[in-house]
Structures are given as structure tokens and as C-alpha cells.
């Protein structure tokens, strides 16, 4: 995607997904991955890649920008591969700043060389305790009374700070927008 390619309302969990940025032909900046309203987006065990669209500058993006101050977006255990800009989170043109979005957070994200990527907005860095709280409430906060067939709720941080769980595979969307 280019700009806000995951946006709007609805609570969503993206697990073990590839997010591919597409740069513009005249510049490398791909924009923003998310623009959440007052809803929750959780990205865990994902990989951010890019198609530079023939541009010599690598396509990069922000994790997201807050459509409202109630935006809640978490990137956890995500391979950023140098595609996320150093600030990590952007402001919205309506005056809502990334700092206003108290639900923005990141935890254990890595660069392609295996070093940890932390955005320059330090208030968005989650602790292991905060991460474990998110994991404990995925079903109630994100999924409500719906449980996907391949969902695995056991994903705690071990003492070394590593995260582990089985991937959710083979999830398909039918024409009625129901996940199968």
C-alpha cells in the first residue's frame, strides 16, 4: 500500500502477515501503514517489506497516524527491515498528534540485522508486563465473542523477552466478509 492502507473502524488482529509498502514513482516515502479511528489494530509476528516502484530510494512509512486520539495500534514482534521511519508514528493533519494517541505501542520489533527497532517516541515502547496484558485480553478486546478456528491464545513473553506462539494460517475471507 501507499497511504493509510489499513484504515477505519473495526477491531483487527493481523498475525504472521506481510505488509508490503509501495513507494511512489517520484519519492521513496510510502506514507502510513495505518489510520485507526477509535478502534484497535494489533500486528504481531508480521514482516514489513517494500516494493520501491523503480525508485532508487527505499520505500519507508510510519507505523500509522491517529485518525482520532482514541486510535489504538500495536506492532509487536514485527520485522521492520528498515522500512519504518525513525519517529515511528506520525501526526494527523487535523491536529491529533502521535503523542495524543495513548493506544499506540510497539514491542520487540526488529530490523533486518536482528537488532531491536524502537521508534524515537519513547512513550510508545511497551514493557513485558504491558505486552502480557495485551495478550491476555486479545479475545475480549479484539475478537469479542468470535473465536477464529486457528486462534492460539497462549503467547506470553519468556524471561529472556522472546515471544513465541503458533501462527494463524489459512484464514480466508468469503464474499460476506466472514472469516473462515
Task: Walk through the language-model features, giving the residues of each.
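Pro/Thr/Ser/Gly-rich low-complexity, intrinsically disordered linker/stalk tracts
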Residues: 159-180
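Sequence-level preference for short, compositionally simple segments enriched
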Residues: 1-166
